[in-house]
């Protein structure tokens, strides 16, 4: 089977009120037009505040539709709200209305796609631990998909939040950075002794490739702005950009960090104000 070229994009934080985010997005659109990928996947936080603003989410949809290539997307915490966790701000959690708004404006929040002989399973990580009916339905779907494809073709996962990290990183992390531990354990049990070949995530605004227990964990950087050192430790590379991914049957995934022409390297609180903690 021929190789498939996929562009991975994440954490764009788009809004009509965010010109810096828009300028960097324009650079992504131009790069996609020049590189002609088979698919573009957005890994969440498409919008600046879609969890509270339907206008931001609609703006994000308009920008996705500008891409001169087929696209798919999963929601992030700023699109539909976060996983419930102790100490979270009141009103920050995902709920049924926010979830439905994503479905109405953007489309499916979890989906399978076959590219380059691989099966890519996209998961709505924001539902995990929510107790919503949609969470149970997604787990049932995921179990069926894993059972169908595990051992038959390479399996890759798409999720906004990283599933895991090193033991020391997990121990030191705030509860909102990675998957909730119960969900992480349930995923491992579903895969059993045949883990996914690749897990792709965003959320952390850093580029990283980490191999753990037979799985490559690829962190896709932000197209908007990285976080300063006092707000987040360094895990990989704090660079704004996208990832070019090549998938071929029988070959490990090939990936490369891309910094498109015109995409500015920005740091939150230094180069632009923090809209979430002002």
Question: What is each PLM-predicted segment?
Answer:
Residues 1, 198, 243-278:
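A short C-terminal boundary segment appended to hydrolase-like catalytic domains
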Residues 1-59, 63:
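N-terminal active-site segment of His-dependent metallophosphoesterases
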Residues 10-13, 44-46, 77-79, 125-126, ...:
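Active-site metal-binding loops of divalent metal-dependent hydrolases
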């Amino acid at each position: 089977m021929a190789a498939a070229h996929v562009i991975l994009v994440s954490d764009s934080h788009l809004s009509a009120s965010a010109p810096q985010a828009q300028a960097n997005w324009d650079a992504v659109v131009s790069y996609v037009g020049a590189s002609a990928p088979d698919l573009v996947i957005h890994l969440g936080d498409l919008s600046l505040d879609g969890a509270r603003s339907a206008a931001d989410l609609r703006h994000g949809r308009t920008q996705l539709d500008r891409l001169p290539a087929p696209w798919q997307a999963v929601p992030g915490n700023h699109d539909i709200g976060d996983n419930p966790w102790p100490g979270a701000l009141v009103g920050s959690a995902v709920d049924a209305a926010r979830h439905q708004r994503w479905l109405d404006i953007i489309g499916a929040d979890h989906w399978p796609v076959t590219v380059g002989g691989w099966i890519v399973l996209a998961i709505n990580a924001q539902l995990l631990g929510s107790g919503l009916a949609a969470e149970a339905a997604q787990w049932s779907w995921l179990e069926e998909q894993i059972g169908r494809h595990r051992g038959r073709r390479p399996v890759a996962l798409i999720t906004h939040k990283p599933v895991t990290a090193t033991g020391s990183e997990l121990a030191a992390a705030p509860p909102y950075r990675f998957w909730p531990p119960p969900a992480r354990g349930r995923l491992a049990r579903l895969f059993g002794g045949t883990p996914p070949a690749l897990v792709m995530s965003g959320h952390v605004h850093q580029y990283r490739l980490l191999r753990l227990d037979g799985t490559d964990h690829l962190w896709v950087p932000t197209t908007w702005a990285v976080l300063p050192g006092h707000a987040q430790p360094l895990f990989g590379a704090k660079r704004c950009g996208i990832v070019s991914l090549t998938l071929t049957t029988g070959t490990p995934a090939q990936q490369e960090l891309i910094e498109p022409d015109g995409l500015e390297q920005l740091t939150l609180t230094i180069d632009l104000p923090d809209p979430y903690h002002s």
